[in-house]
From Swiss-Prot:
Record organism: Caldicellulosiruptor saccharolyticus (strain ATCC 43494 / DSM 8903 / Tp8T 6331)
Ribosomal protein recorded as keyword: yes
CDD domains in alphabetical order: RPS2
Protein name per Swiss-Prot or TrEMBL: Small ribosomal subunit protein uS2
GO biological process assignments: translation
PROSITE patterns linked: RIBOSOMAL_S2_1
Designated gene of the protein: rpsB
Family to which the UniProt record says this protein belongs: Belongs to the universal ribosomal protein uS2 family.
Domain of life: Bacteria
SUPFAM superfamilies for the chain: Ribosomal protein S2 (SSF52313)
GO molecular function (one): structural constituent of ribosome
Length: 258
């Protein structure tokens, strides 16, 4: 059974690409048709590519690899944070800081500064400093937390990047490619798929589409960590309901519509 069904993808609007005048010809193989000046993505390809990406992420996490979720566009920010935290990984959802991968040592010094400021606030140091100085330190802490909060506990350079809209996250893509870090990404019709190791063709502008795909990548991480099939609680309850109904009315195959 595929990770995502055609019905789920359609309902989330994953099939809507960009306007035909804003496209990358390299995405032609992932385009099904054109409708009213909009490219329609071939969801059969998306289903297949999603399965491949899911298996890759799951297998890599089973080996202890870490993943950095990246999505700084408004439609992705909340989802990137929520799903990365849900699966216990790391994220960048505000702005990609130049050198985050290629100059990680310098980034680590900023993270240490953030942790230092957090300790000062917690241990009461702020209480004995002049109010003006404390205000400046708090502003510094909030700024560092905004941009580095999602990676403050990341122990090393990530092994994999998951990206929403590699065209927007161009600097992240370039740094990852320079270091040979594999990239999994939602790739819309205006992106270059050649730069991505695991292409997931889909709409990177719709919040529901981004949420659907990103949540499945997070599920792959959780399954990789647990070594077993992950199912949200709602799905587990549904499975129990299905079994109960089948036991009572096993002659009626149409009671539950999967």
């Amino acid at each position: 059974m595929p990770v995502l069904t055609m019905k789920q993808l359609l309902e989330a609007g994953v099939h809507f690409g960009h306007q035909t005048r804003r496209w990358n010809p390299k995405m032609a193989e992932y385009i099904f048709t054109e409708r009213n000046g909009i490219y329609i993505i071939d969801l059969q390809k998306t289903v297949k590519k999603m399965d491949e990406a899911y298996e890759f992420v799951k297998s890599q996490v089973q080996e202890g690899k870490i993943i950095l979720f990246v999505g700084t566009k408004k439609q992705a920010q909340e989802t990137i944070k929520e799903e990365a935290e849900r699966c216990g990984m790391y994220y960048i959802n505000q702005r990609w800081l130049g050198g985050l991968l290629t100059n990680f040592r310098t980034i680590k010094t900023r993270i240490e500064r953030l942790k230092e400021l957090q300790r000062m606030e917690e241990d009461g140091t702020f209480d004995v400093l002049p109010k003006k100085e404390v205000n400046l330190l708090r502003k510094e802490k909030e700024r560092l937390l905004k941009y580095l909060g999602g990676i403050q506990n990341m122990p090393r350079i990530p092994d994999i990047l998951y990206i929403v809209d590699p065209r927007k996250e161009r600097n992240a893509v370039l740094e990852a490619r320079k270091l040979g870090i594999p990239i999994v990404a939602i790739v819309d019709t205006n992106c270059d798929p050649d730069e991505i190791d695991y292409v997931i063709p889909g709409n990177d502008d719709a919040i529901r589409a981004v949420k659907l795909i990103t949540s499945k990548i997070a599920d792959a991480v959780i399954e990789g960590k647990e070594g077993e099939q992950f199912a949200p609680a709602s799905e587990q309850k549904e499975e129990v309901k299905t079994q109960e109904v089948q036991e009572v009315e096993d002659s009626n195959d149409d009671v539950i519509d999967d």
